[in-house]
Amino acid sequence: MARKKGDGSLRALVIRFRRVGDAVLAVAACSSLKRSFPDIRVDFVLNEAIAPLFEGHPDIDRVVTFTDTDNANPWRYVRRVFDVVRKTRYDILIDMRATPRTLLFSLFSLRTPYRIGTRKPYSRLLHNYRVADRIDPSLDMVQRDLLLLSPL
């Protein structure tokens, strides 16, 4: 994987909204990114209510929060997503949900070399790396989340 010009570090955005349990399990992917790419900067997108659980985690450089107000107003949400992805040019975007709402991050990040998400019919145009998350029913959620790192 090529390094960014300038400071030489890769930048990753991991998107895992809503449920606290799912977000806690998703930290394993952030930790794996840090082990594989020690200089990587990992930003983690969460709802504001659960963000304090992740602030200060050694494998998460920045917690990007969305408020209930951001999520309730579609125009505000779109603007907020746009601001997040334009503020930092990411090398890797990992969409752990691949819902129509989270796909907006990929839509505004078409120059991001690795736009990774789960394989869904509607994600084909926006994720350039799609991973089948139901490939093995014996896999737990952490293992399925880690599969999203396989394109790297």
PLM features: residue spans?
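Catalytic machinery of carbohydrate-active enzymes
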Residues: 1-152
